[in-house]
Structure formats: structure tokens, C-alpha cells
Amino acid sequence: MKQYTATANDEGVRLSRFVQSVTRDFPTSLLYKSFRNKRIKVNGKKGVPEDRIKAGDLIELYINDEFFPPEGAKPTRKPAPKKQQNQPKVTVIYEDENIAALYKPTHLLCHSDRTGDANLVDAFTQYLAQKGEYDPQGENRFKPGICNRLDRGTEGLVIAAKSYAALRDMNEIIRTDLLKKEYYTITVGIPQSGRFTAWWEHDEKNNKVSIHAHQSQDERRKQIITDVDVLRTAGPFALCRIGLITGRTHQIRAHLAYLGKPVLGDIKYGNRKMNERTGTRTQALCAVRISFLDIPEENTLHYLSGKVIKLKDPQIVKQFDGLDKNKQAPAEEK
């Protein structure tokens, strides 16, 4: 028999998932048979697969030792590629016991991929480990996660969760549109300020978006709504504040390109000649502000209601200042 005391990182996890995380090569059929035969208990009572664990729960597993890792064995994890062993230093904009707002620089991945390049999740995990808030070797049931990702070429604010409960509840906040994001971007051409609506279609094979004026006959397209507020202009360029009413893949970049005012430096949707003439090699797009609306009291992150997190002195403003001073900036390509 094995006993476990649930931690904060186990809060809200299904009991069946917890059992699978602490056992090894335990057949699913035997797992559910153990539930039926009362060999899995929580606080002395029969456990049910759908039960949600609470921190402090005492979980007793009357399961043969052959299905548990040897005593003292560390959780089995795939070794990280050499590139990932030393992650970049994390820039923390806001932090509490549950979440952190991080600054993601341009070209840094949010999550790991097959390249093995540095990424924000592993950098945040390393940061928490150095603070003593997370043990990557001893914890095999949860890894700190990113709640709202940004494209690799986009910089700005990203929310990270320290625990399973925080990740679950932040994802619910995002799903119910109780988190609003604002961006700064530099456009090639001066757009009109206002709210713009269009129809979005994603080519998943090529990871490219097309924008249309109307819904398709098969109704595959999804509506997008984007707010544009022109803050400053300099020759053919505009510094704009963008508000996302909907949040779709590449929405800002593709929608502005559809309006004829693409993001400066955007390789996929942008003005290639202007990118080359200005020497801009990355998209001028930055998530500068995150605001929380009225979060329900039953959500553990309710205390964030009304909170606004801002990125101070974003680099994109300095980038625009450089364009403003450059009087040799060429006219917009027709």
C-alpha cells in the first residue's frame, strides 16, 4: 500500500489521472477494477475516478508494488536537448503565489518544439526551481505552464501559471473572455481608427490565414473583430494600439494586411520591399497590456478582478521613434 498527500499542484486533478501519474505500466483495465474493488481511497473513503483532488487529501493505493517506481527513483523525464539546458533569464513584470506575468522577447518560443531552441516555459520552470518553488526532478504530476501564447516573432506580456489550479482557472478566465489584451504595432501605411470586422480562415497545413469580407457557403470561416487606434504617424508609418475583441491565430497581422496596412517586418503577411528598405527583420508587434474583468468568486484567481498589468517603456515605441527621426524613410509602396 502506498500513501500520498496531495499538494497544491494536485488541486483539481482527476483522481484517475493522479493514480496514473504515480504508477508505472498500470493497465487502464486494472485501474478501474481497483476503483470498483475499493483499492483506491481518499481520506479513508472509496475513491471515484472522476473525483477532483484537493490539497491535503490523503490518497491510499492498495495496488501491487510492481506497478510503482522503485523507492527513491526519480520521475522519468525525457532529457532536454542540450540547447534547452541553459534557458534565458526570465523578466518578471508581475508575480504572486499563483501566477506571473512575463516579458517574452522576440524570437523566443513560448513552448518547446522539435528544434530544441530555448523557450519561455522551460525558462520559467528554471526560474521557479532556482527560487525553491518547483522541483523539476521530484514533481511528476505538473509542470508550470503558459496560459496565453504569442507567436515566436511577437514580443510582450505572457501569463504563466505556477500550479495546476492556477493554470485551470486562468484558462477558464481566457475561455470566458474575462482577460483582455492590447498590443502596439507599427503599420506600413496609415490605417483608419475604428472597429473592423471580417471573416477568418486558417490553412493549418501551411499555417497561414486568409481574411474575407463574407462568410463562406460551407460556413468554415470564423468572424474576427479588431479595434485599431492610431497613436502617432511618421511618414508612411503609424504606431497603433490594437484591441482584440476576438482572438484568432495571426488575427492582428492578417487583418491589418487585409486592410492594406500590414505590420512592419512581417514576413508572412507584410510588405517585403518596405521591410527590406527599413532593414526590419522581425514583425513590429508587442503585447503591452493585460486587463482582467469581473472574475467569478468561485474562481481561485478572483482577486485579479479589475487588475491591469502593463509593459513599461516597450521597445516597439523606441523602434517607432527611430523611424520618426529617419527623414529618409521612403514613401509607401503602391
Model regions and ranges:
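RNA pseudouridine synthases
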Residues: 1-334
